[in-house]
Amino acid sequence: NISNALMFGFPNETTQELQQDIEHAISLNAEHLSAYSLMYEEGTTLYRLLQQEKIKETDEDTYLRMYEMLIDKMTAAGYEHYEISNFAKPGFRSRHNSSYWHEVPYIGLGAAAHSYRRKPEVMRSWNAADIHKYIQTITEGRTEQEHEILNKETRYNDLITTALRTIDGITLEDIKKEFGDSFYRTLMTEADKHIARQQMVIKDGHLALTRKGLYISDDIMSDFMLV
């Protein structure tokens, strides 16, 4: 299972240039493609150039046209758009990433690696970020981790922001089972607004984004957050 990665939204990039990149990616015939828009992170050279107005960030309309073209071309080539940034041939979804999106427990090995467990309490932990410190603690036969016990509100927010990224969406029965009726009612009150706007849909017991909703997914997810 070979996966390619594609980044788009570079300064001055045109839709025609992205089209060429997508067509080249398709020609490689890999089983999987991850595609991400360029982000300007504070402290990086790109961010500094942006602040100095030496480069220009892709405007929202152009970005949406690029993303729409990406979806159209990848699905036309037989790839399943199973997560906001991921496409796969049938049967080749990323099992690794899917575990994060569906709350499967995992162990992280290495500096700054994160782990997640559900019993005896739901906890997220992470190793020391400094590689030298991490190696030293392992050599001494001990571990040094920070951790966070996740309450229901945090778990709910995490589930919303991960599950809604996928084509499967949120399993409504899981919300009732894991969080109770009050959380479920809160979810559905917000969902009804977006369903009426054709931004979300309920199908086979799952609440998911529509194609229209994908384009404003961050805004929709923020509407569901418990603060």
Residue ranges and their predicted role:
Residues 1-181:
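C-terminal scaffold of the Radical SAM
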Residues 17-18, 186, 220:
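Residues at alpha-helix caps and immediate loop-helix transition turns in enzyme cores, especially N-
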Residues 180-195:
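Short amphipathic alpha-helical interaction segments
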Residues 206-210:
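Minor-groove-contacting beta-hairpin "wing" of winged helix-turn-helix DNA-binding domains
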